[in-house]
């Protein structure tokens, strides 16, 4: 019987197996940020250890930094974490993309764009959404602080091999429907625990037609379905994306040949298989307090099925049977490691070009990295956003999470391109609705959600 992509990635990195069936995996790339690393570095000091492979480690500042005045860090804990990362990287000789550096950005945006992320690698980071890098045919997953220390010290990690889930996507997406809608559909249909104990492999004709940045969105949110990771077999689009990037291999042809071996054999069997036809998918909007609480834009909110639904409706200030079009939007956030890349900003800009943000709506665009920001500005996207009434910010995690100055006030609703809508995720009492960049941009113009499949809404929006 053939092997799955997961099998090939896993087997090539097993150093040894212990009596409990745990495998010691070699880690090819360790990404680090300011929030989950301080205790790990301190652990090295206390045990008089060094970073085993600083050349396979890369750090950036993203979670805590302000995106408006990046050097004006008023929060004491945030400043301490940023200063500590700077000191730790200097002491342990770990490369750091500091504030203002041309390589700085959200950790899961800069990894791919710098060419650090490559097919066949094992990649870890002290962050849940490390699965993003799986879009390149890498086995990438988030780890805890104690594991961060273990990888820093040994460049290895004890792991139990997960099962393999195949998610086959077929059909062509309608205009106005995106990868974000696919993953929100998957979660709404199968729930936040469907992937527990599995690595999700996305494949099929829909995947083949997707560009790399859409694939990253899919893999980014595999963790929201409980999966260990999300992966996609590398192809010509993958190779073309990596080629020529700063940290990509110089002997590219040799590596491309090796990378081409990472795919699921035709006679391999998944432990679980899910088939989704995307042809009739609509834009999705989450209404509740986890990413599976979502509906199509043309559906009404569901009835209360259990105590969790009741709590979610109460927290969100919504009612069963309410129209998605009637959900008020006071804030719009276009950013995060899910949807802050150049193509995401281009889609959002195409929606708002020549239009105005509705009075009373606060709208932010936060590029995922310095390089994304510069590329967007070269295309004039910043002018489109600013003329429409958006705030054009510096890169960072921003409003994705309530760990920096960009937060949603209590009781107010935010159309967000991020990945989590938990209670308090964007600030105390914040009400988060997960959507695609197009849906978020359109909501900024109307102050409520509209259907981005339509060419225009009351004649007010047209795509260029």
Curated annotation (Swiss-Prot):
Its cofactor is [4Fe-4S] cluster. Pathway: Amino-acid biosynthesis; L-leucine biosynthesis; L-leucine from 3-methyl-2-oxobutanoate: step 2/4. Pfam families: Aconitase (PF00330). InterPro entries: 3-IsopropMal_deHydase_lsu, Acnase/IPM_dHydase_lsu_aba_1/3, Acoase/IPM_deHydtase_lsu_aba, Aconitase_4Fe-4S_BS, Aconitase_4Fe-4S_dom, IPM_dehydratase_rel_enz, IPMI_cat. It catalyses: (2R,3S)-3-isopropylmalate = (2S)-2-isopropylmalate. Binds 1 [4Fe-4S] cluster per subunit. One of its GO terms (biological process) is L-leucine biosynthetic process. GO terms for molecular function: 3-isopropylmalate dehydratase activity; 4 iron, 4 sulfur cluster binding; metal ion binding. CDD domains: IPMI. The keyword 4Fe-4S applies. [4Fe-4S] cluster binds at residues 337, 397, 400. Its EC number is 4.2.1.33. Keywords: 4Fe-4S, Amino-acid biosynthesis, Branched-chain amino acid biosynthesis, Iron, Iron-sulfur, Leucine biosynthesis, Lyase, Metal-binding. Heterodimer of LeuC and LeuD. Catalyzes the isomerization between 2-isopropylmalate and 3-isopropylmalate, via the formation of 2-isopropylmaleate. Belongs to the aconitase/IPM isomerase family. LeuC type 1 subfamily. This is 3-isopropylmalate dehydratase large subunit. The lineage of its organism: Bacteria, Bacillati, Bacillota, Bacilli, Bacillales.
């Amino acid at each position: 019987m053939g092997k799955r992509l997961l099998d090939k990635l896993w087997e090539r990195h097993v150093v040894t197996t212990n009596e409990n069936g745990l495998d010691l995996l070699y880690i090819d790339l360790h990404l680090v940020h300011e929030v989950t690393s301080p205790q790990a570095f301190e652990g090295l000091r206390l045990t008089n250890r060094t970073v085993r492979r600083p050349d396979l480690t890369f750090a950036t500042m993203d979670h805590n930094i302000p995106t408006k005045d990046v050097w004006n860090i008023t929060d004491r804990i945030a400043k301490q974490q940023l200063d500590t990362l700077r000191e730790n990287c200097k002491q342990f000789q770990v490369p750091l993309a500091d504030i203002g550096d041309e390589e700085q950005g959200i950790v899961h945006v800069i990894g791919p764009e710098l060419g650090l992320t490559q097919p066949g690698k094992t990649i870890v980071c002290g962050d849940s959404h490390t699965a993003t890098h799986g879009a390149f045919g890498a086995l990438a997953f988030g780890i805890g602080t104690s594991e961060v220390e273990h990888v820093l010290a040994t460049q290895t990690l004890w792991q139990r091999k997960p099962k393999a889930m195949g998610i086959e996507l077929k059909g062509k997406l309608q205009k106005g429907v995106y990868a974000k809608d696919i993953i929100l559909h998957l979660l709404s249909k199968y729930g936040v625990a469907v992937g527990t104990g599995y690595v999700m492999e996305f494949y099929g004709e829909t995947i083949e037609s997707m560009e790399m940045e859409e694939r990253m969105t899919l893999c980014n949110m595999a963790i929201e379905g409980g999966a260990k990771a999300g992966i996609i077999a590398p192809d010509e689009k993958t190779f073309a994306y990596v080629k020529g990037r700063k940290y990509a291999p110089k002997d590219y042809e040799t590596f491309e040949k090796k990378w081409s071996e990472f795919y699921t054999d035709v006679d391999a069997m998944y432990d679980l298989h899910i088939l989704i036809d995307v042809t009739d998918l609509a834009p999705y909007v989450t209404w509740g307090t986890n990413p599976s609480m979502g509906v199509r834009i043309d559906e009404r909110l569901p009835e209360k099925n259990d105590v969790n639904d009741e709590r979610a409706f109460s927290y969100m200030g919504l009612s069963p049977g309410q129209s998605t079009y009637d959900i008020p939007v006071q804030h719009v956030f276009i950013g995060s490691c899910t949807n802050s890349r150049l193509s995401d900003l281009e889609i959002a800009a195409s929606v708002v070009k020549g239009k105005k943000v509705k009075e009373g709506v606060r709208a932010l665009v936060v590029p995922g990295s310095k390089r994304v920001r510069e590329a967007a500005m070269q295309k004039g996207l910043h002018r489109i956003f600013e003329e429409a009434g958006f705030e054009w910010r510096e890169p960072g995690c921003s409003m994705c999470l309530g760990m920096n100055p960009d937060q949603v006030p209590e009781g107010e609703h935010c159309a967000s391109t991020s990945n989590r809508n938990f209670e308090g995720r964007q600030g105390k009492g914040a009400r988060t609705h997960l959507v695609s960049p197009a849906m978020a941009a359109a909501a900024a113009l109307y102050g409520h959600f509209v259907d981005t499949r339509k060419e225009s809404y009351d004649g007010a929006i047209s795509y260029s």
